[in-house]
Each structure stands twice: as structure tokens, then as C-alpha cells.
Amino acid sequence: MHCPFCSENDTKVIDSRLVADGHQVRRRRQCLACNERFTTFETAELLMPKVIKSNGNREPFNEDKMVGGIQRALEKRPVSADAIELAISMIKSKLRATGEREVPSKMIGNLVMEQLKHLDKVAYIRFASVYRSFEDIREFGEEIARLED
């Protein structure tokens, strides 16, 4: 690794430890040329599957799009940022765990709904109404009834 201070290529690792619940390695390094110390972080590069849209088009997984939908559903609801981050992390983990290179967008929507159901029932109904394109109040009532079962 190049030293950020003198750009030399010779550095040594002084200390390594796991951080971020074991998902990241923090390394303390020292340059052998200028003796400056610096910290690096190492994480695994995990590729998300491509998304197969309902019209058959394929596109890269867009985390921002998913997060935006979740945040709109949870707007002005009493859910902590940590709980939201955990839900997003769980959705991404489940997508990677499929082992598939491509997943239907419907699967992502269902995973989001599953997480929202646990986070906040109102947010779940908000998301479901858009995701399932509710046409009238009856459909809202049916979804609420299913939620209460």
C-alpha cells in the first residue's frame, strides 16, 4: 500500500482488528520510508444481483432507490435511523444470500414489505398501497385486515 504522506510503496501493518461487527478490518500501518502512521479499513466487496424489472429489462441493483422508497414510507413515523439501517442491511443480506446473479424486482418489493411490517404497520400500508397499486379504499381495508390476522 502506498504511503499517503510520501507515496512510498513500503508499509508494514502494526495492528489489525475487526470493527463494524466483524464486517470490516481496521489496520494501523507505518511507512518504512518516512515512519508516518496511518489507518486503513478493509471490507469484502459483495456484489448485489441485477434486478429483473416487471417489463423484462435488467438493471443494476440501486440501493438508493430502495432506501428512498423505505424512507418515504417511514416519513414522520417513530422509527429510529438504526432500525432503518438494520432493515436495509437485512434486505441486502437476503438478496446476496439467494446466490442468484439476477432477482426479480418483485422479490425486492416483498423483502421491503416484510421488513416494514416489522418496523411500522402504517409504513407497511403506505408502501403496499404504492407497490401493489391500490385502486380504492376497499383494497386498503383488505390489506389492513390481512395485517391484523
Swiss-Prot record:
This is Transcriptional repressor NrdR. NCBIfam families: transcriptional regulator NrdR. It holds the Pfam family Zn_ribbon_NrdR. Negatively regulates transcription of bacterial ribonucleotide reductase nrd genes and operons by binding to NrdR-boxes. Keywords: ATP-binding, DNA-binding, Metal-binding, Nucleotide-binding, Repressor, Transcription, Transcription regulation, Zinc, Zinc-finger. GO terms for biological process: negative regulation of DNA-templated transcription. The lineage of its organism: Bacteria, Pseudomonadati, Pseudomonadota, Gammaproteobacteria, Vibrionales. A zinc finger (unnamed) spans 3-34. Its cofactor is Zn(2+). The gene is nrdR. Binds 1 zinc ion. It comes from the Bacteria. Belongs to the NrdR family. GO terms for molecular function: ATP binding; DNA binding; zinc ion binding. Residues 49-139 form the ATP-cone domain.
